[in-house]
Amino acid sequence: MKQILLISVFFLLFSCSGQKKSEEQAEKNSQPESNVKSESSPEKSSESQSVVIAPDSKMVYFDGGSFMMGSENGLPNEKPVHKVTVNPFYINKSPVTVSQFRQFVEVTGFKTEAEKFGDSGVFNFEQQQWQLLPGATWYKPFGPNGPDAEDNHPVTHVSWNDAVAYANWAGKRLPTEAEWEYAARSGKNSGEKFSWGDEVSVDGNYFANTWQGPLDAPETKDGYLFTSPVGAFGENEAGLTDMGGNVWQWCANHYKPYPGNDEPVSEDPNVKVIRSGSFFYDTSGEDSFAVSGRSMNSHETSLFNTGFRCAKDAEKE
């Protein structure tokens, strides 16, 4: 049986269906901007093999360039700030949704690792502890007796391996950790803590799906207890949604300390980076969903607060 890897500086989190905010707001936030690339029709590879492009998977183009990665004001694993250069790339406007993942499964017959193992990581509120819940899957995030996953919410209970399989099918890949942070910063060397600014909320209006209240008495000031529809909290300056909170997101890289950081972590190619933070309680608080916030988990682990978005290489426009 797989082990849930709970070894990061962050307290690893969870995700699923939740209370709905204004339908009008969600609809407004789902409208594509002029710098969003829509890719809804199949393409052909140079080998003349069909490459499927997932439906409604709008992507945002970044020219690439250099930026200062990390934060001197963040957690120890975010230091030191160091210069990184990324090449031009596209990244999905939003995390992959339940609906998009369902099409992948229907076309390919793919089985996630949670389905193969027969369980997946869920936080048990009654017992106030994590558990491997039998039957918890991407389509039944709280197990067979729980509600169905909602189509427009980010897919969860997917391992890094599952995410890579989807990305390969869609003719894409997972973003590198540097690409993810560059996109979260809207391609700028901004000093803002979050993808949207410096505050989690202003006058009771929340900018992301995050945890409120103590772990044993959760509140829903942002309108959701668990996951929210992608885009429900608007976009960053670059036109991306959910670049902080809602669900943790897998990155392509294995986890390692930044250059010059003596963090006592042995590099393991099977331990992958996750970014974004999620809707669930985190001991590191707001630092988990800061643009520089980073954590890790094993490549075969699936949790109900972890999903992903895709990226792909691009030529400079």
Regions found by a protein language model. Give the residues of each.
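Sec-dependent N-terminal signal peptides
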Residues: 4-12
